[in-house]
Amino acid sequence: QAELGYEDALLDQAEPFSQWVIGDSTLAEKLPLNSSKFHVEFTDHIQAFKEQKVRILNGAHTSMVLGAYLSGLDYVGQCMEDPIIRKSLDQTVFGEIVPTVDLPEEKAVAFAQAVYERFENPFVKHALLAISLNSISKWRARVLPTFKDSLAATGKLPKLLTYSLAALLAFYRSSEAGDQCLIGTRTGNTYEIH
């Protein structure tokens, strides 16, 4: 309010992150957006950027949240502060996911570092149970392609992505059926499985 000089009832807090990728490199001269304060990239290979987002941002979430939740954590920020979960995430993202992204390694690493900044944002309380919704289809879309590419490249199962599959199975092990969902148990407390 002090900065604007008036009260904006619709003003909301947002993450300080932006990435614009435009899928036509010939537009770079016509749209001088690189001179703006926002990061804008023009490319003829838009699919690689979509894959980077799905594999690194969404894949990191999907591969981390179920094991972290079952270990007693509730929010992404807690995961980033927990030394064991953080080390596991580092090894997953930089050791198993980034090598499968079809972009120069420095671009994928920079994107992953920006994702980490978002995960560490103390103003965003991103609940692990919210991220867990529809985890089977999310794992299939966000993690399985990386899993397969890693296996094809190395001839070995990617250890931490394999662990994320085991966590998925453990999370979906229900103790009872609810009205519209299954009910799981974590350290004596129940949670809804959607």
Report the location of each language-model feature.
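Substrate/ligand-engaging "lid" and interaction regions
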Residues: 1-194
